Curated annotation (Swiss-Prot):
EC number: 3.1.-.-
Family of the protein in this entry: Belongs to the helicase family. AddB/RexB type 1 subfamily.
Record-linked InterPro entries: ADDB_N, DNA_helicase_suAddB, DNA_helicase_UvrD-like_C, P-loop_NTPase, PDDEXK-like_dom_sf, PDDEXK_AddAB-type
Keyword Transcription appears in the UniProt entry: no
Enzyme class: hydrolase
Protein's name in the database: ATP-dependent helicase/deoxyribonuclease subunit B
PANTHER family the UniProt entry points to: RECBCD ENZYME SUBUNIT RECC
Entries under NCBIfam families matching the protein: addB_Gpos
Length: 1169
């Protein structure tokens, strides 16, 4: 038995000495006794590479690099100690999930916390800690019982927590018993098997890279001391600690304590002990400033280094993004200008996760190959999401969200279909399911999905060929999804035991060819050079299969409910991690200060050197709090270090990082976080500035304009990055600011490079004004043809904003349809219901004015019942909530029909047309226009209601439009082309009255009828008839009426003097109109309708001439942008030059009419000329 201690500060050559010694032994005797190099997990690949890259290693037949875990696996395989089933942390977490559910009633503390996310993982880590520190369930129980009666509340609380941990620990051990081995028991078994391991006898063991050992690891080392020929152990310490432990505040407290522990163990074993002290700093022979920093770190008082300090750079950055971009630029400069290889450079953070996403994004932008050390979670891999979402589909009764989470993993796509085509078809199915509210048995009842692009409440249209083709495609895609998931659901429903449930999931994965699809994805990633991604695809299937195997091995014959099975599977999947090794040798290594191990690093960037980050504040994420640990320590239980001890050890981790690079050390910190909150630099920055006052300083910025030309040149990283910065600089130049000549050189290069078309296209953004140019004539013709057929509302849309019209009617863009009841649906229902009631009355030869209240109830309910199944894919029949809405809509319709009946009783007008169509198959012809540019335009549509009345002067016609919100007619909106419907309908019916009704007619007015169920507020209680009277007033129709007393009295035959309760008109005692009456002369109606015609003609010409301007109006506080669906496309922004509203002025009706008359006269004169 022999042990040699190698002691020395960082950079003194301990690891190099071990490697050289191993290489020498291999050279002298390639087939001699085994050489085992024992290092931490993070260091195995690095040391294997260092040994393998030398020719003297002879292929490493004799020497092997192991971590403790890999050594255990190797020895147990040789000695037969691996005959029991090993359970990984993933399997333990699944087991603990089951145990927690079973033992929840026994908990004193964990009852509420046990259902929180991450709880199982914390418990598993605590169990692992008990194992590593050789704590048995009996010991935990003993401490808990003894402290349960303590007079101190804190101790009793801690004892209750320990009670719950003992329950879980005991139950876990009972489940494992003699058949299984906890992964943390590897080292205990290893210690037991070392005496019979031939590989250890005569072997030379080298131990390096460890800062401390757990009791389990010390048990293994003890057996190695007893049975190996020699052990050599290297520690980063400033002196030998063979006879004393270091002071608590000593920089080398952690490693010195470990040195002392191992030395005492070696003495107890009776080993021959020798020590070699490495005193010279070999790493920094040519960088005396870094050597001084290494030697003087944490020495008090500070002795400043007065010499030049070219190898230490402290960089300040405005943000984390600016910091990482600055690091990327410096890395490229080191490679291009200083001749370093990427493998010579490392980036280190205290917590890599804080920077991981930014590092990935920036380094990919800058084309810097990198490897991030650490085990990344598998939870975002598509296979993990497939399993989770498929179980959620079953749990949630085939809800849309779960189904399409499953679909978007792309594992349900057939192998023979290209991914792009499959994605497009899956997206179309998703849109269909959202629009039709597909869920539950609609997926599984065997019926086909039916597709109709347009659906009317009044008529049934034949399904078009395009709709038939779309329907077939949707059902084909459905067949990718439903059969495998439905089979999984049936198998899980019939499963009796865990074994059957796991088998159901496995068969599901096999049926959809997951292994083949993963292999295909792996090969595609390899071919594209995405090696890390390829490795992930290779590992994830094995990890899932291992998880299933462990589940079956441990609990295969037990019966579980589906919810608990899903919880356990979910827990297991959440714990899976990728074990990646660097896919390439020449790449930047990115790691954390505490876990990563590096060797022969020339340049190191320590990022995120901010207050609270370096040194790190101890996190209290464990089940056991700091107080709990202190209490356990007093009770004689040895566990992992307390927060106070970890805080003391932070200085050693910082020291290790500072002393790692041989050529150059970069420290950087951010001045603000992502939200703009200010951040302070770490005390380490101030300390280094005091110790090394002549250090180099740098500023990492996102805008290079403040830097010297040579510094700005670093921003020219590659074409992609350079283009971005060039555009930014040229924008400054356009704003009359000077820029460096560097950017003109870059610009000239970009304009002549092979990718110049891309650069030119992006450069065009410099002259972006957010103005839409008119369409070319050939494009306009392709979009619209020579003949436009449209609606009045389409023309109103164009007059509101030409670009919005272009987006909806030119590009035919549409909002995604959702399965929900919206205002247009309700409006459509009311229109159709009122038509249905009117048609029924005609069939039954009844009149509105003869209806009783009971009739209104009957007809309204019947109309809603008939139309509800046809509205928005049967949405009113889909749920109890919508059934309630249907009842509310019936109530409103009953109220409205009752009011219409009351109106009819006092009116001389009666309906002559309901939902009256013009154009197409309608009884009225379309409005047609011959445009100046040779195109033609016709307007088609439907009129809600046309009423007629016989007067002494002939036939009167009026238009009534049903509205779900209160509406009046603003002549300013008519003038600007924003409200054209009612006057168009009136013009149309009057123009074609003879062809339609066989007699010329006179316009009587245009009125809006508000469909609603008003709520009456009164200062005093009202009688029922008074309430009805107030409600009746709320239905007064607004609009414009003919300035004719006879016509007005025909609308309200009760009107003699005073104000009408039916229309917006009133009469004085002398029979003339009151001033607040909304009346116009027949000439004025004619002037308005002629203006509307001219407005249509002008709009048609502008559309066919290709006008697509982004020109929304603003009238008072109204703008079309408020409810526009295309804001993200036009990107209208008042802060951009030339993006201004067309401000329209609102004027009194008589002023508007006078203006229209004047313009009409000018138009007539122009036509005459």
């Amino acid at each position: 038995m022999e042990i040699q201690f190698l002691a020395g500060r960082s950079g003194s050559g301990k690891t190099t000495a071990i490697l050289e010694e191993i290489k020498e032994q291999l050279r002298l005797d390639p087939l001699g006794p085994p050489i085992i190099f024992l290092v931490p997990d993070q260091m195995t690949f690095l040391m294997e590479y260092e040994l393998a890259k030398t020719s003297e290693a002879g292929g490493m037949i004799r020497a092997k690099v192991f971590s403790f875990t890999r050594l255990a696996w190797s020895i147990l395989q040789q000695t037969g100690g691996a005959n029991r089933q090993f359970v990984t942390s993933t399997g333990i977490q699944m087991l603990l999930r089951k145990v927690i559910e079973e033992q929840k009633d026994k908990f004193k503390v964990f009852k509420k916390a046990s259902d929180k996310p991450g709880f199982v993982e914390q418990i598993e880590k605590t169990m692992a800690e008990f194992k590593r520190y050789c704590m048995l369930p009996e010991e935990i129980e003993k401490i808990s019982v003894e402290s349960m009666l303590s007079e101190y509340t804190e101790e009793r609380r801690a004892a209750e927590k320990l009670h719950d941990l003992h329950v879980l620990y005991q139950q876990m051990e009972e489940h494992l018993q003699d058949e299984y081995v906890h992964s943390e028991d590897y080292l205990n078994l290893l210690a037991q098997q070392i005496p019979s391991a031939e590989e250890i006898k005569g072997a030379h063991i080298y131990i390096d890279g460890f800062y401390q050992f757990t009791p389990q690891q010390l048990l293994v080392i003890e057996q190695l001391l007893l049975h190996a020929a020699k052990v050599t152990a290297a520690f980063t310490v400033d002196q030998s600690y063979h006879d004393r432990q270091p002071n608590e505040l000593d920089l080398f407290r952690m490693t010195g304590k470990t040195y002392f522990q191992l030395y005492q163990l070696a003495k107890e074993c009776g080993a021959d002990i020798s020590e070699t002290i490495f005193e010279r700093n070999h790493r920094h022979l040519y960088t005396p400033d870094l050597a001084y920093l290494e030697h003087q770190y944490e020495q008090r008082p500070v002795q400043p280094y007065q010499e030049n300090t070219p190898h230490l750079t402290v960089s300040k950055s405005a943000s984390k993004r600016a910091e990482i971009e600055g690091v990327a630029r410096d890395i490229l400069d080191l490679v291009r200008e200083k001749g370093l290889r990427l493998r010579d450079i490392s980036v280190v953070a205290r917590h890599v996760d804080d920077y991981k996403d930014t590092l990935k994004e920036v380094f990919r932008d800058y084309d810097i190959p990198f490897f991030i050390d650490g085990n990344e979670s598998m939870q975002y891999h598509p296979l993990i999401e497939l399993i989770r979402s498929s179980l959620d589909v079953i749990k949630g009764n085939w809800r849309y969200e779960a189904v399409f989470r499953c679909v978007k993993t792309e594992f349900l796509f057939p192998l023979e279909i290209t991914k792009n085509k499959a994605r497009e078809q899956a997206d179309q199915l998703e849109n269909y399911c959202i629009a039709y509210g597909v869920k539950g048995e609609r997926w599984t009842n065997g019926s086909r999905f039916h597709y109709r692009r347009f659906q009317s409440l009044d008529e049934d249209f034949r399904q078009t060929d395009q709709e038939i083709e779309m329907e077939q495609m949707l059902n084909d895609v459905k067949e990718w999804i439903t059969p495998p998931l439905y089979q999984l659901q049936k198998r899980l429903k019939n499963a009796q035991k865990v074994r059957d449930m796991v088998e159901a999931v496995y068969v599901f994965l096999e049926e959809i060819q997951v292994p083949d699809k993963l292999e295909k994805a792996r090969l595609e990633a390899e071919e594209a050079g995405r090696l890390a991604e390829a490795m992930q695809h290779g590992q994830v299937w094995d990890a899932v299969i291992q998880l299933m195997d462990e589940f079956v091995d441990m609990l295969g014959d037990e019966e579980l409910s589906f919810p608990l099975f899903q919880q356990m599977i979910d827990t297991g999947l959440a714990s899976l991690k990728f074990a990646l090794i660097p896919p390439s040798l020449d790449q930047v290594f990115i790691g954390s200060m505490d876990l990563s191990r590096m060797y022969q690093v020339k340049c190191m960037f320590i990022i995120g050197v901010n207050d609270g980050v370096i040194p790190a504040r101890p996190s209290d994420e464990s089940v056991l709090s700091e107080d709990d640990r202190e209490w356990l320590k007093r009770a004689g239980a040895e566990l992992a270090e307390t927060g106070k001890e970890r805080l003391l050890d932070e200085q050693f981790l910082i020291y290790q990082a500072l002393s790692s690079p041989s050529h150059h050390l970069y420290l950087s910190y951010a001045a603000s976080d992502a939200e703009g909150r200010s951040l302070l630099p770490s005390p380490l920055i101030k300390y280094c500035q005091e110790l090394m006052p002549n250090h180099q300083q740098a500023l990492y910025v996102l805008d290079p304009e403040l830097l010297e030309d040579d510094e700005q040149l670093k921003f020219v990283a590659n074409e992609h990055v350079s283009l971005s910065y060039t555009i930014s600089q040229l924008q400054q130049w356009l704003n009359q600011y000077p820029i460096s000549g560097v950017w003109w050189s870059v610009y000239n290069y970009l304009m002549t490079s092979p990718n110049r078309d891309v650069s030119k296209n992006i450069m065009s953004s410099l002259f972006f004004t957010n103005r839409a140019k008119p369409l070319k004539p050939n494009v306009t013709k392709e979009l619209y043809g020579d003949h436009i057929q449209g609606s009045v509302s389409r023309m109103e849309k164009f007059n509101a904003c030409a670009f919005s019209h272009f987006a909806s009617h030119g590009l035919k863009l549409k909002d995604r349809q959702f399965y929900k009841l919206e205002a247009p649906d309700i409006g459509q229902l009311f229109h159709s219901a009122l038509k249905h009631i009117s048609d029924t009355l005609v069939e039954q030869k009844k009149d509105w004015k003869n209806l009783t209240k009971e009739d209104c109830v009957t007809y309204s309910r019947h109309a809603i019942e008939q139309l509800a199944p046809r509205l928005q894919k049967e949405i009113l029949l889909s749920s109890n909530r919508h059934a309630y809405i249907k009842e509310k809509l019936q109530k409103i319709l009953i109220r409205v029909s009752s009011i219409l009946s009351e109106h009819a009783k006092v009116s001389g007008f009666s309906p002559v047309g309901l939902e009256l169509g013009f154009g197409g198959q309608g009884p009225l012809p379309p409005f047609t226009f011959q445009l100046k540019n040779g195109c033609t335009m016709e307007l088609v549509g439907r009129i809600d209601r046309v009423d007629k009345a016989e007067g002494s002067k002939g036939l009167f016609l009026r238009i009534v439009d049903y509205k779900s919100s209160e509406k009046g007619l603003d002549l300013a909106e008519v003038y600007y082309g924003l409200a054209l419907q009612m006057l168009t309908y009136l013009d149309l019916t009057i123009t074609y009255s003879k062809e339609w009704l066989g007699i010329e007619a006179t316009p009587a007015g245009i009125l809006y009828f508000h469909i609603h169920d008003p709520f009456i507020q009164a200062p005093i209680p009202l009688a029922e008839d008074e309430i009805e009277q107030e409600i009746f007033k709320k239905f007064k129709m607004k609009g414009l009426l003919l300035e004719d007393v006879e016509a007005v009295k025909l609308m309200d035959q009760t009107l003699e003097s005073g104000r009408s309760q039916v229309i917006q008109a009133g009469l004085k005692k002398d029979g003339s109109f009151r001033s607040d009456s909304a009346v116009l002369s027949e000439d004025h109606f004619h002037i308005l309708t002629q203006h509307v015609r001219r407005t249509f003609e002008e709009a048609g010409e502008r559309i066919t001439n290709g006008e697509v301007a982004i020109n929304p109006y603003k009238l008072k506080d109204q703008t079309p942008c408020r409810f526009c669906s295309f804001k993200s496309i036009c990107q209208f922004d008042e802060s951009i030059e030339d993006n201004d509203f067309r401000v329209l002025t609102s004027e009194k009706d008589d002023v508007v009419i006078e203006r229209i008359k004047k313009e009409g006269d000018q138009y007539a004169n122009t036509k005459t000329e």
